[in-house]
């Protein structure tokens, strides 16, 4: 039975860069999708974030973090561990076409997590406005060495106290 109530969640949207490139065959795409699922699951576990709701899109994942998890406490370790998993994956795949690079977008707002998917305005903002923004695409394409680029919404920045921007280190994680 659907739930109508929305609560405030940190919503993280992750999308694989150029997942449908012509040189990526179906077996390679499937391997990449499986690896991404493992990377995100491991990152959530290492960050001690339990009971998150996830939607697997094939070449990406949408995550609604539990509402009781403070935004900054959740995001910093999650992004760090996703970056660690990406670096490990990419170092162990000699073929460039099997390497994974991600666009990550984050919003804080209303969401309704179901057992296997998430809905709500926070997801729409993270996906439609941020994840597909040219700013985020340019940030990732402008540095071929970094495994991901991260963009947070104005609301997330305001509520979490990240106003003024966040400095990312050489490895694409907060320092």
Give each language-model segment a name:
Residues 68-171:
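Catalytic beta-strand-to-alpha-helix segment of the class III nucleotidyl cyclase homology domain
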